[in-house]
Amino acid sequence: MKSTSKIYTDKDSNLDVIKGKRIAVLGYGSQGRAWAQNLRDSGLNVVVGLEREGKSWELAKSDGIIPLHTKDAVKDADIIIFLVPDMVQRTLWLESVQPYMKKGADLVFAHGFNIHYKLIEPPKDSDVYMIAPKGPGPTVREYYKAGGGVPALVAIQQDVSGTALQKALAIAKGIGATRAGVIPTTFKEETETDLFGEQVILVGGIMELMKAAFETLVEEGYQPEVAYFETINELKMLVDLVYEKGITGMLKAVSDTAKYGGMTVGKFVINEDVRKRMKEALQRIKSGKFAEEWVEEYGRGMPTVVNGLSQVQNSLEEKIGNQLKDLIQKGKPKS
């Protein structure tokens, strides 16, 4: 089992490496807004590249950030940061970035999908690197303003200049990540582990586990309201404990009955067959099969996603959850 021996912090990074360089942040959504403001507040020269003059354009202006059309933002940029959704990046690259960017400009990503699966093939004379914050954009901004930072991953795909890592760490410092710590990785590792986590636990796994547990109780005649509390609603409390204190801390916080039941039945439910299917899911990611399917799905208008979302919205557990929201919120203390 490999483990990194190096975590980069403020002392390993220097903003002077990119001072005076023009940075174009493409996109002004959750991450784009946070990055642009943090980099600006770190004393760097930042513009935002957008495809049209809409709400994001006006929001950037109100935040004191200069918005430009993408092709205008990249033509003079030394560093181009892609912070638009994965499936928009290839089209944006082909139509609005590649034809207009200046020779040798750096290409920066927050997720490795498009580079790893070769949907974007960068010029040979560009440094290509990634800084991937391990938190949503609003948290990246909130922590920065409070003097902290969200941890991040850093990876170098192309190092033509010989200074790609130094520039990547400077960007990481500019958004506040080095205040916490930046862990080195590769585009391959970040992409494959990110997709795996989303599919088998964070979105896919936990969603299906909650659904299966809820439906099992309801099918056996238990009230759906009670089933919802026991299989879905209480999950937040346990996840919060794991987040704050680790798995050991969570186990120490629950009852002895819960500990014994969890340690015995948990392995019965998540057994070797499940682990085998997890490995199969990982192989689909590593082979590129998932990426191929997702690109095709996206091109067809995402029918699987649309139909799946509709099924979830119309499910019994969702209806019960919506009915219980007022009850759940009623007991929360006023802040």
UniProtKB/Swiss-Prot annotation:
Mg(2+) 2 binds at D194, E230, E234. It comes from the Archaea. Pathway: Amino-acid biosynthesis; L-isoleucine biosynthesis; L-isoleucine from 2-oxobutanoate: step 2/4; Amino-acid biosynthesis; L-valine biosynthesis; L-valine from pyruvate: step 2/4. The keyword Signal does not apply. It catalyses: (2R)-2,3-dihydroxy-3-methylbutanoate + NADP(+) = (2S)-2-acetolactate + NADPH + H(+); (2R,3R)-2,3-dihydroxy-3-methylpentanoate + NADP(+) = (S)-2-ethyl-2-hydroxy-3-oxobutanoate + NADPH + H(+). GO terms for molecular function: ketol-acid reductoisomerase activity; magnesium ion binding; NADP binding. The keyword Amino-acid biosynthesis applies. GO terms for biological process: isoleucine biosynthetic process; L-valine biosynthetic process. Its EC number is 1.1.1.86. Residues 5-185 form the KARI N-terminal Rossmann domain. This is Ketol-acid reductoisomerase (NADP(+)).
